[in-house]
């Protein structure tokens, strides 16, 4: 299984991160849809930012906006095998999984999700990409992102 993101979507996430840092000196986060192709590989696409509270080292997505987003994407992608990717920035820090990040990732395992993706980027365009399998057993693996 490979994870891909096209250059346009990658640049969009990086530009969101740069804009948040240059205007607010803050992190920013958002969501993307991840679709599976016929070979079993996954493509991160359509990165968006949602209403959120941002700070120097945190970004908290609005739960109501997140629920609306999940519903809209479920309708749009109802005939395609898809999952979600939570992405966020660490601006001038390294790309790593903080304790807060790991807690946020774990929230996906509390619901019905069997598989989820997470991506953290920084202004140097470094990243960590994690695939989390929740069922039948819990496994987390940081993987290479093919840009």
PLM features: residue spans?
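Conserved beta-strand-loop surface patch within small alpha/beta domains used
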Residues: 1-85, 92-147
């Amino acid at each position: 299984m490979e994870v891909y993101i096209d250059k346009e979507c990658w640049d969009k996430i990086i530009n969101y991160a740069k804009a948040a840092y240059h205007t607010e000196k803050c992190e920013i986060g958002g969501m993307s849809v991840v679709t599976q192709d016929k070979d079993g590989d996954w493509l991160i696409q359509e990165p968006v930012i949602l209403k959120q509270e941002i700070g120097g080292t945190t970004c908290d997505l609005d739960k109501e906006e997140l629920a609306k987003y999940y519903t809209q994407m479920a309708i749009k992608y109802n005939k395609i095998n898809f999952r979600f990717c939570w992405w966020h920035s660490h601006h001038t820090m390294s790309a790593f999984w903080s304790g807060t990040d790991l807690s946020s990732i774990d929230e996906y395992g509390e619901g019905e999700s069997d598989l989820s993706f997470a991506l953290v980027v920084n202004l140097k365009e470094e990243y960590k990409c994690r695939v989390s399998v929740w069922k039948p057993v819990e496994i987390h693996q940081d993987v290479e992102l093919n840009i």
